[in-house]
């Protein structure tokens, strides 16, 4: 793979991106964050982090000391999942492999946070049916799309509107997964309430048409997310917890900017987090997906939403904010955004193809192109074989 063409890098070493910041208990040496990157290399059966490659993959990207790494989305329980090749953190075998990964990250003097991920209607209903598991969402009468509805009915596993007892069970599973993460050596956890997965399905009025205390109003739609946050904070401490949100996202059939009340919904969540913070329970960070990337399967520049921005969050939430979405090819935007001293920048796809991305950002070096075809391929190719800048020069990539 050659370097990215028609891209003029800018050295960002003189910006706030390379100023230290404390996130929870972690003293980061810069503000370029690795956000959660699903890679589908976990081993089936068992949803076990890949024994052959995962340690090396994470160690490569932790090579710059003081880097914050948020792991790929990780299932708290079998019921949370529905993808065979994404990892979990409920079994002894899974925890054993995660322990090795966290150790490798820490040996490079970087930091490991686990993203806790529950799929809901984005799961494969036939995979869940095979394993005797429900196909869950906020409601049972609106599916993610026609294809998912057809799969669910064919598998005799129609979408299930989870009961209040089942919500309580999910909360317990988030708590146990957070405890497992910390026991395995992680520095913290990120609760995934973005990108159309289960917690986001409760936040969005398109997917949530419940009439109980978990639907029907901004406050009720936020209840499940906030219950998870509160329970996990009580279990491991607020300084070890972050929350991810995607106000304008349309991935997995979310409303995004088409929903007129969407900013009010997220402003309420952020306000509740700030209220808790003032009472002594400030989360380590809030992580926002930018309207620049409303759907992670689209390439840079596609699917941008221009009708709003995440700036509203800064006037409500007064803690650190990670912002992720199509920043790597726009260093001029990064230069402006990091002028706010609370801002960190998440770099996703280009951290896949550039294990030394932090060095390249600092010095303004060319970036390796990524190969989208290997994002979710069960192979070492496209996973642990991307070269550093020096290695790429030896391969002649600068001449391609």
Swiss-Prot record:
Binding site for FMN: 38, 115, 244, 349
Any GO molecular function: NADPH dehydrogenase activity
Main location: cytoplasm
Gene3D superfamilies, per the entry: Aldolase class I (3.20.20.70)
Active site: 197 (proton donor)
Phosphoserine found at: 353, 379
Cell compartment(s), UniProt: Cytoplasm; Nucleus; Mitochondrion
UniProt similarity note: Belongs to the NADH:flavin oxidoreductase/NADH oxidase family.
Miscellaneous field: Present with 15100 molecules/cell in log phase SD medium.
Name of the featured protein: NADPH dehydrogenase 2
Organism: Saccharomyces cerevisiae (strain ATCC 204508 / S288c) (Baker's yeast)
GN (gene name): OYE2
């Amino acid at each position: 793979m050659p370097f990215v063409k028609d891209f003029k890098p800018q050295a960002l070493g003189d910006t706030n991106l390379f100023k230290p910041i404390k996130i929870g208990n972690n003293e980061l040496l810069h503000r370029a964050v690795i956000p959660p990157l699903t890679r589908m290399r976990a081993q089936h059966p068992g949803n076990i982090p890949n024994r052959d490659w995962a340690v090396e993959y994470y160690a490569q990207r932790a090579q710059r000391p003081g880097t914050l790494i948020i792991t790929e989305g990780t299932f708290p329980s079998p019921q949370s999942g529905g993808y065979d090749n994404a990892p979990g953190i409920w079994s002894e075998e899974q925890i054993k492999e995660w322990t090795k990964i966290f150790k490798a990250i820490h040996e490079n003097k970087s930091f490991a946070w686990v993203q806790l991920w529950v799929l809901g209607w984005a799961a494969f209903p036939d995979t869940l049916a095979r394993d005797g598991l429900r196909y869950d969402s906020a409601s049972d009468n609106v599916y993610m799309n026609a294809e998912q509805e057809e799969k669910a009915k064919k598998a005799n596993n129609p979408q299930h509107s989870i009961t209040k007892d089942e919500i309580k069970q999910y909360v317990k599973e988030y708590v146990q997964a957070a405890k497992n993460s910390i026991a395995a050596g992680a520095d913290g956890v990120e609760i995934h309430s973005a990108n159309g997965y289960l917690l986001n399905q409760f936040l969005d009025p398109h997917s949530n048409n419940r009439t109980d205390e978990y639907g029907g109003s901004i406050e009720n739609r936020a209840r499940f997310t906030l219950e998870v946050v509160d329970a996990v904070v009580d279990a491991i401490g607020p300084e070890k917890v972050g929350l991810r949100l995607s106000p304008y996202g349309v991935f997995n059939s979310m409303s995004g900017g088409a929903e007129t009340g969407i900013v009010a919904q997220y402003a309420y969540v952020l306000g509740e987090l700030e209220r808790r913070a003032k009472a002594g329970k400030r989360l380590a960070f809030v992580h926002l997906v930018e309207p620049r990337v409303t759907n992670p399967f689209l390439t840079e520049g596609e699917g941008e939403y221009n009708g709003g921005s995440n700036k509203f969050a800064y006037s409500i939430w007064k803690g650190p904010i990670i912002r992720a979405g199509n920043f790597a090819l726009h260093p001029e935007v990064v230069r402006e955004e990091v002028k706010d001293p609370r801002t960190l920048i998440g770099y996703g796809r280009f951290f896949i193809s550039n294990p030394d991305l932090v060095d390249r950002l600092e010095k303004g070096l060319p970036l390796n192109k990524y190969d989208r075809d290997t994002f979710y391929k069960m192979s070492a190719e496209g996973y642990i074989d991307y070269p550093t800048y020096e290695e790429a020069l030896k391969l002649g990539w600068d001449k391609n």
